[in-house]
Regions:
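Conserved, well-structured interaction surfaces
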Residues: 37, 45-49, 75-154, 170-176
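Core domains of carbohydrate- and sulfate-ester-processing enzymes
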Residues: 67-76
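Membrane-proximal, proline-rich intrinsically disordered regions
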Residues: 12-61
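Short linear capping/connector segments at secondary-structure termini
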Residues: 22-25, 161-169
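Conserved small/polar residues in nucleotide/adenosyl-binding loops
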Residues: 180-182
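Sec-dependent signal peptide recognition
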Residues: 1-3
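Proline-centered turn/helix-capping motifs that create local helix->coil transitions or kinks
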Residues: 14, 51-52, 150-159
């Protein structure tokens, strides 16, 4: 029985090493104009919804009006109700755009995706100069907006101009205090 089990594990080795053809990678995301435009749409996907009461407390989280409909399918304002009652906390806050929890999306991932787009836009075949310039300007504006949103929510933040390589030294990952805009 032991020999049979040993042979069965060695027989699967080549089968498990096969990589499917349709796996999306960063390189394939910028091979055509259409796939690059889809990646640019990903950069837009992180924009906070200003009209959503769970993502914008300015709508209904004041003491003047409290709306809470437990069975309301269209608008559940439980988050804003708890915020108005003083139930916000520092360890796991509502509308956390830093980590992407409790109603907020992780805006540092959005900034990383914008940087990936800006690093790879030069490799797109068939993209005209005016359109390329417009796409670059749009993604830079999104990146600035995400930095502004984080600054507005948390105060001084590191400005992420470019993505840091995974094999970078620890010194390269440290942000000098003078680079943090106050």
């Amino acid at each position: 029985i032991y020999i049979l089990v040993l042979f069965s594990f060695t027989a699967c080795q080549n089968y498990l090493d096969i990589v499917p053809d349709n796996i999306a990678t960063i390189e394939t995301a910028f091979t055509t104009r259409t796939s690059a435009e889809r990646f640019m749409s990903t950069c837009y996907g992180y924009i906070p919804e200003h009209a959503n009461v769970e993502q914008n407390f300015a709508l209904l989280a004041s003491d003047e009006i409290w709306y809470y409909g437990e069975r309301d399918f269209y608008m559940n304002n439980e988050t804003s109700l708890r915020l108005a009652k003083g139930m916000q906390n520092a360890t796991d806050p509502y509308c956390n755009y830093w980590e992407g929890r409790r109603g907020g999306s992780n805006l540092f991932i959005a900034i990383r995706d914008c940087n990936i787009f800006l690093e790879n836009i030069k490799d797109i075949p068939g993209l005209k100069g005016n359109e390329k310039d417009r796409w670059i300007a749009e993604v830079k504006a999104l990146k600035a907006f995400y930095h502004f949103w984080l600054f507005r929510m948390y105060g001084p933040i590191p400005i992420v101009d470019e993505n840091i390589s995974l094999d970078a030294s620890p010194e390269a990952t440290q942000v000098v205090l003078s680079l943090i805009h106050i």
